[in-house]
Amino acid sequence: FAMLYFSDHGVSVSDSANPVHHDGHVQGGYSVPLIITASDISSHQSVSRKISARHFAGIFQWLTGIRTENIPPFNPLTDEDNEPVMVFNGEKNVPADSLKPQPLILPDRR
């Protein structure tokens, strides 16, 4: 068996009435884990670099062995992508690194 998991969007945190939400204007809104497991995987490997969700079809091909001539397989453990990760911020595609980081929310100490 093989299983691939990733969320459709990240979450942001604020001190608003809706404290956990999607925010297309901060990096946390697009930061999601990618988890791959399979019956023939015998070790844990962690990758800390950003991988665009646009590689999903290639990752799926790499994992399953299914091939098409239109999309090359993409191994997220070894294949590098020199293009910046682009995200849609609700208005246009922008580089993910151009978004502001998630602000630190400190607890109210009243």
Feature annotation, model-predicted:
Residues 1-110:
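Catalytic domains that recognize anionic headgroups
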